[in-house]
Amino acid sequence: MIEAVDICVQRGKKQILKHVDLQAKNGAITVIIGPNGSGKSTFVKALSGEIPYSGKMTLNGHDVTQTKTSKMATMRAVLPQSTTLAFPFLVHEVVELGLSINKFTIAKKQFQNLPQKTLERVGLADYGHRLYHQLSGGEQARVQLARVLCQIWEPICNKIPRWMILDEPIASLDIQHQLVVMNIARNFAHRGGGVLAILHDLNLAAHYADKMILLKQGKVYCEGSASTVLTTQNLRDVYSCSLNVSELPQADIPFILPQTAQPLMK
């Protein structure tokens, strides 16, 4: 489980996160949504140990600030919003970083084919010897997902709870590969892993999320099922635009359509 209690993040004079409390459970997909600047990525950076914060954050019962980075790396893998790398890595070298973090070696029989298998899962089977920095943004995001899958090799999930932390994993992808990524996340959760994802596509979020957390101006505005969170009034209040929310036929899943492209006048 991921548990955050009274999390605050300050950047200069501006408070980015304001007393955030939230929980995300293993075996489920928890999706954080909210407008740009609401604190979504800041929360992920705090959870990843990239930025300081006040309050308490635990992952599988381990305090994020008190646990060695090497230990945390065995329990969670992060797909960051930016997938740019400064060095001229080959694609297979980027993917193999996931194995090195967990102190696995490519020479071990059970792991030697894992990087290639994960590239196949994300639709990049023939990309292993291409230069990473020459790929498109969407291709780089899929390579990073392959790295994440290597780092939290799924069959281990039932012995050591593992987490995927995904910061806008589908932002640069076409619809085909958006579904590939989200189905990988769903399968990972079904196998006992935990998924915490930031998404901007509210309709895909509604389809895949077991729990949704809506942020507004650094605070948790509401949380719960998609039907609870994605109401016309909630979205109007948080996003300041007119949206119509209905339900998909034969499914208890909200579906969102714009009523107008113009922002509400205040």
Curated annotation (Swiss-Prot):
Residues reported in the UniProt entry to bind ATP: G34, P35, N36, G37, S38, G39, K40, S41
Protein's cellular compartments: Cell inner membrane
Topology term for the membrane: Peripheral membrane protein
Molecular function, one GO term: ATP hydrolysis activity
CDD domains: ABC_Iron-Siderophores_B12_Hemin
Domain annotation ABC transporter: ranges: 2-242
Pfam family, one: ABC_tran
Main location group: membrane
GO CC, any one term: plasma membrane
Its job: Part of the ABC transporter complex HmuTUV involved in hemin import. Responsible for energy coupling to the transport system.
Subunit field text: The complex is composed of two ATP-binding proteins (HmuV), two transmembrane proteins (HmuU) and a solute-binding protein (HmuT).
Record-given protein name: Hemin import ATP-binding protein HmuV
Taxonomic lineage of the native organism: Bacteria, Pseudomonadati, Pseudomonadota, Alphaproteobacteria, Hyphomicrobiales
